[in-house]
Amino acid sequence: FMFDLKNGSLPQVSYIITPIELSEHPPYTPNDGAWIQSHVANSLMKSQYWNRTVMIMNYDETGGFADHVMSPLSPKGTDGEWMEDPFDHKLGQQPVGPGYRVPFYVVSPWTRKGGVFTEIASHDSCILFLEKWSAAHGKNWTSKELNPWRRKHMSDLMSVFDFSKRDMSVPRLPHVSKAVSYTHLTLPTN
């Protein structure tokens, strides 16, 4: 991503999966993940792509059972949302999602609200957003992996944005010291 960004060859959609040392998983620290997020966001905001880019930083998992908010469930038996427990058939049908809340944030010229997004979303929401974005650019497609219940009940993230106002100023992000667990990493800068 960083090399494509610097060389002006960034594709229309990119996924960044960090090395384990920058994942915030133990034994690594939140600072390690914050460093790479800050580096990517700052590099993007200073690049030629800033005026037409949306960066969604989506964690891959939750805080688990510590979350005080119950996850939404589809009605029992909803196709694609319930399955028989593979380890204990006596338990019968069990929900498979959407699961506990997962943190994410969006950085773009169209997201300056500084608020908290409260719609029900899941990892599927990023796919729903990409479908909407693609359709707006004349490239209609639909992910067949999403069932009708998720399409109806999960956010497509469109309300995160105000596309009538584009603020090209570069927000100042907090300083994050370099990840100590990954000091051998050399990334290009703008």
Where do the language-model regions lie?
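Anion-binding catalytic surfaces of enzymes that hydrolyze or transfer phosphate/sulfate esters
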Residues: F1-Q37, A41
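Loop/turn elements at helix/coil->beta-strand transitions in domains of secreted/extracellular proteins
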Residues: S9-V13, Y49-M55, R101-V102
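Conserved small/polar residues in nucleotide/adenosyl-binding loops
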Residues: T183-T189
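Metal-dependent active-site segment of extracytoplasmic phospho-/sulfohydrolases and closely related
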Residues: H39-W82
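Substrate-binding rim/cap in mid-to-C-terminal beta-strand-loop elements of soluble/periplasmic
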Residues: I16-E24, K76-W133
